[in-house]
Amino acid sequence: MIKTLFIILLCGILSACQPVDIQDVDIAAPAPKRTVLKVGTLYGPQIYLNSEQGESGFDFEMAQRFADYLAVPLEMIPYTNRKQLFAALKENKIDIIAAGIAKTPNRSQQFKLGPTLYKVNQVLVYKEGTPEPKDISTLSGEITVMANSSSVNTLTKLQKDYPELMWNQVNDKDNEELFALIANGELNYTISDSNSLLINQRFLPELRAGMILEEKVEVVWLLPPNNSDRLMSKLLAFWHKERRAGTLEHLNEKYFGHVKRFDYVDTRAFIRAIDNILPEYRSFFEEYSGELDWRKLAAASYQESHWNPSARSPTGVRGMMMLTQPTAAYVGVDDRLDAEQSIRGGAFYLKDMMERLPDTISEAQRIWFALASYNIGLGHVEDARRLTESMGMDPSAWRDVKKVLPLLQQSKYYKQTRYGYARGSEAVHYVDSIRRYYDTLVWIDNQTKTMEIIEEKEQVEVIAEEVPAKSHVSAQ
């Protein structure tokens, strides 16, 4: 069921990961003054999503900050058609495009480009289990990309060195549909930016990254080519302010930092477990999570025990949440092998860790510090925070503390701390893994709900069609 769900809905939810070039559109009249900031975007987990938990995405968060900087409300306007998105900017229907757009010569000619958000590599994508390509010149005719995309720009550059290089262009499929076709073995190769591939691997683990075809491609916002000097000036001032504040680094860590480590076997196993094991315990996670998103608690439990109530480690921790005897006693768990008790106790302990953290840590980041504390202890995390501050970094930012945690394994650093040696790199891996599990679980959970809505709507339509027919038969 999950596999089918991926292929059917991957396009709709993640359609924004691969930007495309646009065709020339006539310039419209100057834009009137606006009382809101209208930002055109595309749907995608790293760009813009609007779910039960509210709006999210790298571009959304930056756009919200920019609107706050301008002291105007933000209006995000999602487009499903890229051509319409670019035309809307040319026609002054929107003020900015913030949609994970790659910088290309064509876009530089047609738009004003904002400062660089981040950089990506253009990589060859192929299927797990097939031979990894070593020479781009041997793949002529086997690469399929979207027409007018930045992938075409990459291939055109390569063609100068490999004149025989040819590729297939499709107009009726987007990048995520191409990913699904690669995963199913229906296509051999495509090209993607590295971040989009890493994000999609959480849902389609069969995707593999091959050779890097173009390095450090800039991702930018787009502004109208004319009558946007004032907005560009404000954007540049805002950008410098946010860079100094570490906002770009924080958002890069939030949306991309945890997806850079990919494990094919583990991802496939987790997807199967969501379908086969989680339903038995989901109600416990929902009941005891409280204000915490139940999927974060479930992700932590999978990292601990792979949802095995009888799990045991060599150090003596046991159960779904792998509690020690002292911790079990502290949270009121009598039987660590009882799944419900273990989940209840683990949830209580995790929330207790969150409450004991300093108030300087933001609500959004407290969970990551709490999970690290769950893994190696609150004392060691506080040691890492103090070291972080002594190095001139932010002790309340997970992006900085995760850099310092591995230093607790080096005597040069841990001898300066109160609690001494700790496996800090293990804690970083622990938190990153939970974040990946959580992202995958959220995606699958949202798609399941979408499918249920679609099926319910179809059933209503079928019933509506049948009722008149039955009434007509009765009248006879």
Curated annotation (Swiss-Prot):
Major location (coarse): membrane
GO biological process per UniProt: cell wall macromolecule catabolic process; cell wall organization; peptidoglycan catabolic process
GO cellular component: cell outer membrane
Region LT domain, annotated ranges: 260-476
Stated family: In the N-terminal section; belongs to the bacterial solute-binding protein 3 family. In the C-terminal section; belongs to the transglycosylase Slt family.
HAMAP family: MltF (MF_02016)
Name of the protein: Membrane-bound lytic murein transglycosylase F
Record organism: Shewanella frigidimarina (strain NCIMB 400)
